Amino acid sequence: MRFRVLNTSPLFDYQEANKITQGVDVFKEIYAIKNPKKETEFWIKQIVANHSTLRCIHFRLVDEQPKSVVMQIIRATKGHPQPEVQSSRPDWTGKERSSDPYEDKLFMQDNTAESFIEMAKQRLCNRTEEKTRQFMYQLVITLRTSEVPFLRAVGFCCMPSCKWNGNRCPEVRGCGRFNKLSDYIIQDYRDCYIEEE
């Protein structure tokens, strides 16, 4: 398993994108950009804020996992990650197509912080298949222990949806550990509009 930031200078690219939204071209000031003292904490704040300019930073995951796990990972499409998976086409591989869901497949996925965190929200959920959830935990631990501050920050921002929603489950049929987010929203609705119906 490996992660790699695809940007040569993520901090510069991010700050350039931010300045462009303000109508300022900072390309001439490339040497003026300094790394923050607590870079991982800086990135955590930026990732949690989730401004659109953060999408200019991309990173790649490459690994080999059972086909059943790979399919669950690449089907998490919020934030538009870009997956590539080892082909099973007999005319390319010279082998018959396998129906074994546990056959290992090489895959690669390009992510933004947003797309990876959205995938983690889904795949760290207690309702996710155990093998997929355990693989997602491995990915998060790998990110959290990365030497790259941006990747480390992404790892620490990964948690199930219920944690992002203040311990309120967004699923229709959750695991039962937390109350449903929809119940809180419905109660708000009833408190505001019950007399109209």
What are these model-predicted stretches?
Residues 1-197:
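Family-specific signature for flavin-dependent thymidylate synthase
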